[in-house]
Amino acid sequence: MARHDDEDQGPQLVHLATLGVTAVPERLDGVALILRMPSGAGGEKATLADWIRLCSKEDCALITASVAVGAEDLPPNGVDGFVSFDMQADRALREDFPDMQIVAADLPSRHVAMQAGNLGADALFFGDLRADTLEGMQAGTDHDLAEWWVEIMEVPCIIPVASAADDPDYAPEFIAVPLP
């Protein structure tokens, strides 16, 4: 995932799915997929392999997110990156996995967001990625913080929205839409 320079294109699409819950579709239209990995999803290896194959076929980055509190794991083999809910704690992973894309999440303040950017996050997710519903994810979005981020910072951000047609006024680089 990278910042694009043509402002007329609008935000790029990031899909959201939950391992073991979301059906694997035939195609993907987005540049990335954030695959939420709930606690106990370890037995879903065949499903994870299906997501890896699909993303590879569709040239779509696969980013995993261990969403259970305190259950962050190393990203599985075959994925392009992972979500960090604590960039301060995960900063060694940036050094250990320099080619992995790291999306920082759980950003309650400007200070924490700036710290995540300074520690090497490739993108920031503004919203509650651990929420079980889109409404919960959106309720956790601090739009003032996200707008400030878009205007001031270079690291791109991701905003959860209901559909690919939604485009927040402050023009984030990426929008995240749950797969049906």
Residues of each region from the PLM?
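Conserved N-terminal beta1-alpha1 strand-loop-helix module at the mouth
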Residues: 1-80, 95-108, 114-121, 138, ...
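Glycine-rich phosphate-binding active-site loops on the catalytic face of alpha/beta enzymes
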Residues: 35, 81-93, 123-137, 164-180
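Glycine-rich beta-strand-to-loop/alpha-helix junction loops that act as flexible
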Residues: 65, 157-163, 177-179
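Short acidic, glycine/proline-enriched helix-loop-strand junctions
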Residues: 100, 132, 141, 151-157
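Glycine-rich adenosine-cofactor-binding loop
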Residues: 104-106, 127, 145, 154-165
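Short, glycine-/small-residue-rich phosphate/pyrophosphate-handling segment
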Residues: 140-145, 175
